Amino acid sequence: MSSASRNILVTCALPYANGSIHLGHMLEHVQADIWVRFQRMRGHNIHFICADDAHGTPIMLKAQQLGITPEEMIAAVSQEHQTDFAGFKISFDNYHSTHSDENRYFSELIYTKLKDNGFIKSKTISQLYDPEKNMFLPDRFVKGTCPKCKAVDQYGDNCEVCGATYSPTELINPKSAVSGATPVMKETEHFFFDLPQFADMLQAWTTSGALQEEISNKLNEWFTSGLHQWDITRDAPYFGFEIPGAPGKFFYVWLDAPIGYMGSFKNLCDKRGDIDFDAFWSQNSDAELYHFIGKDIVYFHSLFWPAMLDGAGFRKPSNIFVHGYVTVNGAKMSKSRGTFIKASTYLQHLDPECLRYYYAAKLNNRIDDLDLNLDDFVARVNSDVVNKLVNLASRTAGFITKRLDGKLADTLSEPALYATFTSASERIAEAYENREFSRAIREIMALADEANRYVDEKAPWVIAKQEGQEAELSAVCSTTLNLFRVLMTYLKPVMPELAARAEAFLNVTLNWNDIEQPLLAHNVAPFKALFNRIDPVKVTAMVDASKEEQQTAAPKATGPLADEPIAPEITYDDFAKLDLRIALIKKAEAVPEADKLLRLQLDLGGEVRQVFAGIKSAYSPEQLEGKLTVMVANLAPRKMRFGMSEGMVLAAGPGGKDLFILEPNAGAKPGMRVK
């Protein structure tokens, strides 16, 4: 039986609001959902929340590419995410967004408290700046070589190879991920969270049992090398919350992202009206707070986040449950191989409970990576769920409904066997509690094997053919369905939809604490198929569909490319016919008789050409004189009523004031050919 009711708040890491959910994300959400459903079955008061992480430069830039506002983009992504999670039966009590009034309130509150308590420092720093885009570059928009392990193509905040964290200015050979330009250094004032002040508290907390041993050991390396102040500022332009009293400065996304847990929970409290927010977040709270996260974001959750909470007068997490990555067929998820599978693609082809079961069968409480082997996935689900579990009901239910009026026996013929199944309750509960889901599944399937041995030994299909054996037939089938009920109760956190169909058939709710009493003289419903085998053809179709999605995944062009698509393909010989030359604009003057034309005198380095250009709406003559430009030098002269035009200058833009003549590098000389 379960112990006294506990008050528990569970969160999953917040998915970033600029892309789709894939099967790697889904591991964490399935893991947390199984644990939450188990706790609900045990009678505990548990709240399960999440939100979209909706701030940052990546979202701002992607929205620009799509030609929409960041608010429009994150609203659409949130709807997509929630649809995917619902499809996989993730039972959130609330799903919110970090771009919310609640999150702004708590972000400003925590920042203000940290500042008032002396934990926020201000200093002028030199930061990487994109000279082409005229913007400071956030960590994730600088890429280069890791200063620690020398791995190439790493982001500006942490290395995905060795796990080191660093400043973007420490990268070797940095490049802007926005334009590809080499960044320059530029000074700006930033605010820092003084993490070193929390070193003693964090060292004690991280070794208190609040983290897995592997994580605690890893964090010890960072304590050994010393903690550093954390830059919590980003410069405009930025999509996020402006820092109070600091115009043009914004909270770094990793400051307000974990605060999103509080924002989402406050949103739930306000909607429900019967939940006390402070009972879960105050410093003296005795409620339990658990974060399920991936191993790639341990540093933020196990150092910055508890320090922020402590410094602002809130409670720290009870535990942080860290999992590994998902590989597919023994390798990193691959777009080209079709193993980078979106949740929505999976749902178009397969039952989500198949993946829930497979993940559960392989999950433990360590941070090992989990391999989704697609052949094993098919074999295990078909063998365990269909052949072993559902088969128990399908082999015996028909006899109950057709021969025994749909009613189970009024006594249990095998009480010792039944006791074997119910006595496993606490072992399986302990496995669920400790997130040893694979151990729970092994226990359940071992019992399923025992139940099938019982059915094989008793052979109800043989008994059914014998005259006067209705009592024996009833005893065997009733025992089998009672064993099936116990097994389905144990599996309910993993496969809630299958459990719901079993409940409809058994005509009873599957409650953990009810299994001690078997179903006697109980009516069941006519049996319907409970679960379908996985067809390997559907798995292949899912992989093929993922390949096709990647081939067409490039976002639809917006802006100039969409307005004027690329012209039909030409050959190199076609291009070679064009003679493009650098030209110096010696003189420019308006053509009084024409609204759009300027008369240009172009020096080709020994020859001067007269060209009429329709750029009067964008340039005055004074702006052009002395500039280098590019002209088509071998275009046939064209006689106009103002004179002869002996070529064409090149310009870009839709027209009007938005016309831009091409200006080559200052090193180019008049007369040079462009090739």
Swiss-Prot record:
Bound cofactor: record note: Binds 1 zinc ion per subunit.
UniProt function note: Is required not only for elongation of protein synthesis but also for the initiation of all mRNA translation through initiator tRNA(fMet) aminoacylation.
Uppermost EC category: ligase
Pfam family of the protein (one): Anticodon_3
Motif 'KMSKS' region location, chain numbering: 332-336
Native source species: Tolumonas auensis (strain DSM 9187 / NBRC 110442 / TA 4)
Subcellular location, record wording: Cytoplasm
Major subcellular location class: cytoplasm
PROSITE patterns, per database record: AA_TRNA_LIGASE_I, TRBD
Chain ranges for the short sequence motif 'HIGH' region as given in the UniProt record: 15-25
NCBIfam families xref list: metG, metG_C_term, PRK00133.1
GO molecular function annotations of the record: ATP binding; metal ion binding; methionine-tRNA ligase activity; tRNA binding
Catalytic activity, as annotated: tRNA(Met) + L-methionine + ATP = L-methionyl-tRNA(Met) + AMP + diphosphate
UniProt binding sites for Zn(2+): 146, 149, 159, 162
Gene Ontology biological process terms, A to Z: methionyl-tRNA aminoacylation
Assembly and interaction partners: Homodimer.
Family note: Belongs to the class-I aminoacyl-tRNA synthetase family. MetG type 1 subfamily.
Entry-linked PANTHER family: METHIONINE--TRNA LIGASE (PTHR45765), METHIONINE--TRNA LIGASE, CYTOPLASMIC (PTHR45765:SF1)
The name this protein goes by in its record: Methionine--tRNA ligase
